[in-house]
């Protein structure tokens, strides 16, 4: 059965991911409902499940409305975030494996951005054009990582090292299009890093044409993401603090 992956840009910089198999779809972190509903209905697709990486409003805001339209859809979210994602129907924790659209999905504990943040990894999605998939919310961005709102640099370092161990070809489906700004900062830190500079040029060109830079890949992030390359929690914490305060000149 044919599978496909789609990115739906919404709001200022959110990206809602839609994974389709046959006549059913899975939606990841729907910030808002109307564009998702319109996209699915135009293609005569039913909503099978919603995957929630964490509780922030720009990730769960559209889910209740989508459930009104497709009340049988599962909502898979962290068991440790029941109070903040009260409409979840399938609570999970890191290390769990669930079946979604006939595919095995591994739940990964990547707490740092929030205390109960999880990611979803599909190691072997069916479909000739589909490589391994990682839906990582606000933990790993292309060229960056999430702010430490409820977690520590140690937790983020552990989370990124865990993600770095995934296969290089894994598609990194993060929830925001922050790549250009992230790489602008990174190039300012390492202006002689030719791999980084070239990636920044590529992304600037894509964004100038109104195209997304996502999905990235684990291999690309290993080569160009200073946070993933950090050798210690202390180094990551320094970089995160620096970027939080940095403004382009």
Curated annotation (Swiss-Prot):
TM spans, by residue? none
| Cofactor details (free text) | Binds 2 Zn(2+) ions per subunit.
Extract the coiled-coil ranges from the record.
none
Its BP terms in the Gene Ontology are:
methylglyoxal catabolic process to D-lactate via S-lactoyl-glutathione
E.C. no: 3.1.2.6
Q: Name one GO molecular function term.
A: metal ion binding
CDD domains recorded for this chain?
hydroxyacylglutathione_hydrolase_MBL-fold
Q: Which keywords does UniProt give here?
A: Hydrolase, Metal-binding, Zinc
Asked if the Swiss-Prot or TrEMBL record annotates the protein with the keyword S-adenosyl-L-methionine, the reply is no
What SUPFAM superfamilies does this protein's entry cite? Metallo-hydrolase/oxidoreductase (SSF56281)
- Amino acids binding Zn(2+) 1: 54, 56, 113, 138
Task: State its cofactor.
Answer: Zn(2+)
Instruction: Fill in the subunit field for this protein.
Output: Monomer.
User: What is the recorded function of this protein according to its Swiss-Prot or TrEMBL entry?
Assistant: Thiolesterase that catalyzes the hydrolysis of S-D-lactoyl-glutathione to form glutathione and D-lactic acid.
Name of this chain's protein: Hydroxyacylglutathione hydrolase
């Amino acid at each position: 059965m044919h599978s496909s992956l789609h990115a739906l840009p919404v709001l200022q910089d959110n990206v809602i991911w839609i994974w389709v198999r046959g006549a059913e779809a899975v939606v990841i972190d729907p910030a808002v409902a109307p564009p998702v509903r319109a996209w699915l209905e135009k293609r005569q697709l039913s909503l099978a499940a919603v995957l929630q990486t964490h509780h922030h409003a720009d990730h769960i805001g559209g889910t209740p409305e989508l459930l009104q339209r497709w009340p049988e859809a599962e909502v898979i979210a962290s068991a440790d975030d029941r109070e903040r994602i009260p409409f979840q129907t399938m609570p999970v924790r890191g290390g769990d494996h669930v079946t979604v659209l006939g595919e095995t999905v591994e739940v990964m504990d990547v707490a740092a951005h929030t205390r109960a943040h999880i990611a979803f990894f599909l190691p072997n999605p069916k479909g000739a054009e589909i490589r391994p998939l990682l839906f990582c919310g606000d933990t790993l961005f292309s060229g960056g990582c999430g702010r430490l709102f409820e977690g520590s640099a140690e937790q983020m370092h552990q989370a990124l090292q865990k993600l770095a161990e995934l296969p290089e070809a894994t598609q990194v489906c993060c929830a925001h299009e922050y790549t250009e700004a992230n790489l602008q900062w990174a190039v300012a830190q390492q202006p002689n890093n030719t791999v980084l500079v070239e990636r920044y040029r590529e992304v600037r060109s894509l964004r100038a044409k109104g195209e997304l830079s996502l999905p990235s890949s684990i291999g690309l992030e290993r080569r160009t993401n200073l946070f993933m390359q950090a050798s210690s929690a202390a180094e990551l914490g320094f970089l995160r603090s620096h970027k939080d305060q940095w403004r382009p000149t």
